[in-house]
Amino acid sequence: MAYELDQELFTLLQSVDTPTVCNAIEVAQGKRGFSEFTRGTMICSAPKGGAMVGFAKTAKIAALSPPSEDQEIIKERRMNYYRYMSEVTGPAVAVIEDVDYPNCIGAYWGEVNTKVHKGFGLSGALTNGVMRDLG
């Protein structure tokens, strides 16, 4: 099901922080409900960049163990990932879970993947993994 985010709501969401949005949802639902939240420290790689707002484009990554599949399967899966991420019809954010957490070693977000995803029109990325060479 496709959802649309009108400009007025988009602008409003950009103007508030995440705790404000969570509190508003709890008020609307009439109960406290967000028990599945980050307990660690979040680090913003571009603090002057403003709020990221958009629909989540999700994926999972891993790097601790080498892949065991045939190279053609790996290539097809990667191409499907990039096709999926490139299908942006509105505001979107990449949300990538590193399943190796807390022992992440695959710095997926570096200069190249950052530029590729920006080229797709994504507003930014959220990950529990590692980043490098973003400059």
Question: What is the meaning of each model-derived region?
Answer:
Residues 5-80:
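N-terminal low-complexity or amphipathic/hydrophobic leaders
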Residues 17-24, 55, 109, 113, ...:
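General structural feature for long, well-ordered alpha-helical segments within catalytic domains
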Residues 83-128:
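Extracellular/luminal Protease-associated
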Residues 132-135:
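Histidine/lysine/aspartate-rich catalytic loop segments that bind and position anionic ligands
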